[in-house]
């Protein structure tokens, strides 16, 4: 006897409202997982994303693409004219939601650099697949392509997901390898700087001697620490154990020596030798270690960069010039130089003082035409008077500089003759006391400079008022003698010193 057949109900097709409800639930889940929200930090992704999570993310991306296709096919063309006021708001809300999804998808599709990276990696994979029948990309291949572009962390994740969707096998630790490369990407630049400075064909202009080259060669063992290691060592700085503190300081110093060299190289040709710049940068590094607060979560190399730059800049301001210029004025000179270069490129000619003053902020910032001329005069480097000039190098720069204080020969002869006549008048017309006071007040030999009433009073022990009366009487006698002999005492008036 055959068993009765079971009645299986044929599944009914879902209505449009049911489909829309499922879509809204799925979108709510995506929002909760922050797919449509802010991108997660790249670092956290490395240690949180598992294989199952990546699979779920691929499904989410595929779902978003499906929604985008449905939107393009289902949404009817907009009717011309105004929409009736009684039109349902649900359609409007759906359009906004689709616009959000569209923006989320376009954020990746409209990035040219992201598409270039994907195409380059696919080309590398195709070449390897043809030669070795290899269906995978190595960490080195991926890093070599990413190093040519500056992509944010979320774009890198998108690139890796696209490669997996295309069936390309990636190493299991690719995210961690990329993160390590991005954390230490400055090291390659610093290594190139050190290699350039340690080459045998280095020019004398860089002022690198054998001792500095030996120091640069020893930096191969100086490796920058990652963030976790910096935090662990920085905590030891607060230790009460002196040996532990010394160890932590030594680790932070040795791991950042290449950073000091890289910054010092950018300040060459500013008046200090390269070894002096390195030494000042090391002092700034030690200052940064003493001020560093690990609890704020900052990377030490980023924090130390500003202290190193400040130490080098102050050293250049204090030591590079024969006549010291204040640090704030050095910064103003650098600002003016940058403004002048910018205007030169913009206008195609040398900017005027008025244009420079306006570029620097004008009257509101205190920059006038006179102030600009003053700053330019301060920025000039001093030149030695003994510097040789000319092709023969027998002449000196001082030979061509005019001495404004020197007298012409005829002026000197006339002045000497007048002094001899005045000396004779003083001896013949005045008493010893009057002659002494007049000589001190006018500055005649043996007194080579004029003296005030107070100085004369202290010298000869006579009150100021009495000295003034004696001087007035003596000058009256001399004027009478001059009138009688038809002489001139005009040159004496310039030598008198006001009280």
From Swiss-Prot:
Specify where the region named Disordered lies, as residue ranges.
1-25, 68-89
Q: What is the native source organism of this protein?
A: Mycoplasma pneumoniae (strain ATCC 29342 / M129 / Subtype 1)
Please provide, alphabetically and separated by semicolons, the GO molecular function terms listed in this UniProt record: DNA binding; sigma factor activity
Pfam families according to UniProt: Sigma70_r2, Sigma70_r3, Sigma70_r4
Self-association or partners: how does it assemble?
Interacts transiently with the RNA polymerase catalytic core.
GO biological process: what's one of them? DNA-templated transcription initiation
Q: Any keyword Transcription regulation?
A: yes
Transcription in keyword set: yes
Ranges where the record places region Sigma-70 factor domain-3: 331-412
The short motif Interaction with polymerase core subunit RpoC is annotated over 276-279
Give the UniProt family note: Belongs to the sigma-70 factor family. RpoD/SigA subfamily.
Q: What does this protein do?
A: Sigma factors are initiation factors that promote the attachment of RNA polymerase to specific initiation sites and are then released. This sigma factor is the primary sigma factor during exponential growth.
Q: In which residue ranges does the UniProt entry place its DNA-binding region annotation? A: 453-472
Q: Which UniProt keywords apply?
A: Cytoplasm, DNA-binding, Sigma factor, Transcription, Transcription regulation
A Gene Ontology cellular component where this protein is annotated is: cytoplasm
Record region (Sigma-70 factor domain-2) = 252-322
The subcellular location is: Cytoplasm
Basic residues: compositionally biased ranges: 1-12, 77-87
Query: Where is the major localization of this protein?
Result: cytoplasm
Q: Output this protein's name.
A: RNA polymerase sigma factor SigA
Q: Which domain of life is it from?
A: Bacteria
Show the segment(s) annotated as Sigma-70 factor domain-4.
425-480
């Amino acid at each position: 006897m055959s068993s009765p057949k079971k009645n299986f109900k044929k599944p009914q097709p879902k209505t449009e409202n049911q489909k829309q409800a499922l879509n809204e639930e799925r979108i709510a889940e995506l929002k909760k997982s922050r797919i449509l929200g802010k991108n997660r930090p790249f670092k956290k992704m490395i240690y949180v994303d598992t294989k199952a999570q990546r699979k779920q993310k691929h499904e989410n991306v595929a779902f978003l693409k499906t929604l985008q296709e449905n939107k393009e096919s289902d949404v009817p063309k907009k009717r011309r004219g105004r929409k009736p006021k009684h039109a349902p708001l649900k359609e409007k809300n759906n359009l906004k939601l689709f616009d959000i999804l569209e923006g989320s998808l376009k954020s990746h599709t409209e990035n040219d650099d992201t598409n270039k990276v994907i195409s380059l990696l696919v080309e590398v994979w195709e070449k390897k697949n043809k030669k070795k029948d290899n269906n995978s990309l190595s960490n080195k291949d991926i890093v070599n392509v990413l190093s040519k572009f500056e992509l944010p962390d979320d774009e890198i994740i998108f690139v890796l997901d696209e490669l997996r969707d295309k069936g390309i096998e990636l190493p299991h630790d690719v995210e961690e390898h990329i993160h390590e490369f991005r954390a230490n990407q400055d090291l390659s630049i610093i290594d190139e700087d050190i290699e350039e400075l340690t080459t045998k064909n280095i020019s004398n202009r860089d002022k690198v001697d054998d001792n500095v080259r030996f120091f640069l060669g020893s930096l191969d063992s100086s490796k920058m620490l990652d963030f976790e290691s910096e935090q662990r060592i920085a905590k030891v700085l607060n230790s009460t154990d002196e040996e532990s503190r010394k160890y932590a300081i030594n680790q932070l110093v040795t791991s950042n020596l290449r950073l000091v060299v890289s910054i010092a190289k950018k300040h060459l040709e500013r008046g200090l030798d390269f070894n002096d710049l390195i030494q000042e940068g090391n002092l700034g590094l030690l200052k940064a270690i003493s001020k560093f607060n690990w609890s704020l979560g900052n990377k030490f190399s980023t924090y130390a960069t500003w202290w190193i730059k400040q130490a080098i800049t102050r050293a250049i301001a204090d030591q590079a010039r024969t006549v010291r210029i204040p640090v704030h004025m050095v910064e103003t000179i650098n600002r003016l130089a940058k403004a002048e270069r910018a205007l030169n490129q913009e206008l195609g000619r040398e900017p005027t003082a008025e244009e420079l003053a306006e570029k620097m902020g004008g009257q509101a910032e205190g920059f006038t035409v006179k102030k600009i001329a003053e700053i330019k005069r301060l920025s000039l480097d001093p030149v030695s008077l003994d510097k040789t000039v000319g092709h023969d190098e027998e002449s000196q720069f001082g030979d061509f500089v005019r001495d404004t204080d020197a007298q012409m020969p005829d002026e000197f002869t006339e002045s000497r003759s007048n002094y001899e006549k005045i000396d004779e008048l003083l001896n013949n017309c005045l008493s010893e006391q009057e002659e002494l006071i007049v000589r001190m007040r006018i500055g005649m030999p043996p007194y080579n400079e004029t003296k005030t009433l107070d100085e004369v009073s202290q010298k000869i022990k006579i009150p100021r008022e009495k000295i003034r009366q004696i001087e007035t009487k003596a000058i009256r006698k001399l004027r009478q003698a001059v009138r009688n002999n038809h002489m001139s005492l005009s040159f004496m008036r310039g030598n008198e010193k006001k009280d």
